[in-house]
Amino acid sequence: MSQLTYLFRTAPHSHSSGREGVDALLAASAYCEALSVVFIGDGVYQLLAGQQTASILCKDYAPMFKLFDLYDIEHVYVCQQSLQQRGLTSEDLLIDVEVVDTVRLQGVLHNSAQLLSF
């Protein structure tokens, strides 16, 4: 059972929740080993490689996702249907993830003691 699950479901850079979620996740990883991270819906765009943020005057926090390995964040799931609906594949993403169907995602969310949504 995962003690904490971080659920990313919003597109990056439209507001600060994505950045705040990554900051909270990295901070929690210092105290908690049982972490899971889930990207669904527009949240899959958080992991999209090649984001150009200079034109919208936003700081690009996408490189922070590459810190997951350093922080031993191993359970990273992406919704297969969300990728397909947006014409994306796992090769379009910044980091290695486990692409799973909605049934598996429901299991991950159900087995979580605490769910934090961003």
Curated annotation (Swiss-Prot):
Gene3D superfamilies: DsrEFH-like. It is found in: Cytoplasm. Keywords: Cytoplasm. The keyword Metal-binding does not apply. Its main location: cytoplasm. Pfam families: DsrE. InterPro entries: DsrEFH-like (IPR027396), Sulphur_relay_DsrE/F-like (IPR003787), Sulphur_relay_TusC/DsrF (IPR017462). One of its GO terms (cellular component) is cytoplasm. Belongs to the DsrF/TusC family. PANTHER family: PROTEIN TUSC. Could be part of a sulfur-relay system. This is Protein TusC homolog. It comes from Vibrio vulnificus (strain YJ016). The lineage of its organism: Bacteria, Pseudomonadati, Pseudomonadota, Gammaproteobacteria, Vibrionales. The gene is tusC.
